[in-house]
A protein has these predicted regions:
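A short glycine-rich, Lys/Arg-flanked "PGG" loop and its adjoining helix->strand segment in the class I
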Residues: 62-77
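C-terminal alpha-helical "lid/dimerization" subdomain adjacent to the S-adenosyl-L-methionine
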Residues: 15-16, 77-148
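Conserved acidic residues
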Residues: 47
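Short N-terminal helix/helix-N-cap motif within the alpha/beta-hydrolase-1
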Residues: 6, 58-63, 88
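Short catalytic micro-motifs in class I SAM-dependent methyltransferases
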Residues: 53-54
Length: 154
């Protein structure tokens, strides 16, 4: 998948500096640092790091936030959208990669503080939520969504 992505970028005339993907694991818990593939200095100093609807799939969302903030420049922004806490759903378990049934504002705030991205922290609930068709069987569930942001300390 990554090779195809990089090939398509190159075919569009984009340089490696403009668009390029690498394979790596930022949240490997078996070591203090991510894989060697992610050690290149060009993979640090970002203006923004985002996770869209994914933190509830990580076994350790706090570690994910830590590792993302490490890659931001001072003043860079961590931006996350995900679900607020909700009850478990029948048949939608860890088999589908759901590790957490939403994240509370308190947990997200503590996560940003721990990661060093608490400056200007805000968490907003977006609209009236999101309706999701689970498993393509017509069973719809509604989830409240939040958008959280914070800046890495200078």
């Amino acid at each position: 998948m990554v090779a195809v992505y990089n090939s398509q970028a190159q075919n569009q005339g984009l340089s490696r500096d403009e668009m390029y993907a690498v394979i790596g694991d930022l949240i490997a818990a078996d070591g203090p640092q991510p894989s060697d593939a992610l050690a290149d200095e060009c993979l640090f100093g970002f203006d923004i790091a985002t996770v869209g609807g994914g933190l509830h799939h990580f076994a350790d969302p706090e570690l994910a936030a830590d590792r993302l903030v490490e890659r931001l420049r001072p003043g860079g922004v961590l931006l996350v959208w995900d679900f607020l806490p909700h009850g478990p759903m029948s048949g939608h378990t860890r088999d589908y990669g759901v590790m957490h049934h939403g994240l509370s504002e308190e947990r997200v705030r503590a996560m940003f503080e721990r990661a060093g991205a608490a400056k200007g922290f805000s968490l907003e609930v977006l609209g009236s939520g999101m309706s999701i068709d689970v498993g393509g069987h017509g069973e719809k569930i509604r989830r409240e969504i939040f958008l959280a942001r914070g800046e890495k300390a200078v």
